[in-house]
């Protein structure tokens, strides 16, 4: 059985698990891990096949969630960014007793555009899959550039993301492809109507991957959840707005 790379920091009375996005690894949280570990017992995770969690191939969302859960604390706040938001949501659906609160960051229950649903055009995702086999480092870099576009700190935010990717060996092409397949095919809009734990959704107003149009649609579909939009953030609000981001999580902790 392959093990997932997992690091625990801090001694807070509430556990907080952070799940990163596609192509990245847990180093992406270094801008906020000191602050958060002073309030929580913080768990930094490399998703299977990413970063230091080697030896995994492409996985379905359900298998990825189960693999992560095997090493997780009994009960925690689960926070997932982008693709990680789908993994955290899947865990909330299948093991609600282990999720004190669900937080999704710049994530969509359905990343792919559908009828009357804004998202990434399926041919864009298919194009990324095609380009992965040609030049996967450049493809990952293009995807990262999309994530910070439009913010005041776009250049330096993109550099921070690139540094995270380059700090560790690149994931295998089939793992990257499998992640894109999840983004292309998964739709959790209806299932997430049934979660009952506190559910906080955080967005960036300038996000080019998760259009802000989905926010009111999901407010209506999931009236039990709360949403907040960072006015000047794109796809990585914790990098562009770290202090504000951490404050929201500390406030959530008081409520669980």
Swiss-Prot record:
The keyword Cytoplasm applies. Monomer. It catalyses: 6-carboxyhexanoyl-[ACP] methyl ester + H2O = 6-carboxyhexanoyl-[ACP] + methanol + H(+). Disulfide bonds: none annotated. Its EC number is 3.1.1.85. This is Pimeloyl-[acyl-carrier protein] methyl ester esterase. The keyword Hydrolase applies. It is found in: Cytoplasm. It comes from Escherichia coli (strain SMS-3-5 / SECEC). Substrate binds at residues 22, 82-83, 143-147, 235. The lineage of its organism: Bacteria, Pseudomonadati, Pseudomonadota, Gammaproteobacteria, Enterobacterales.
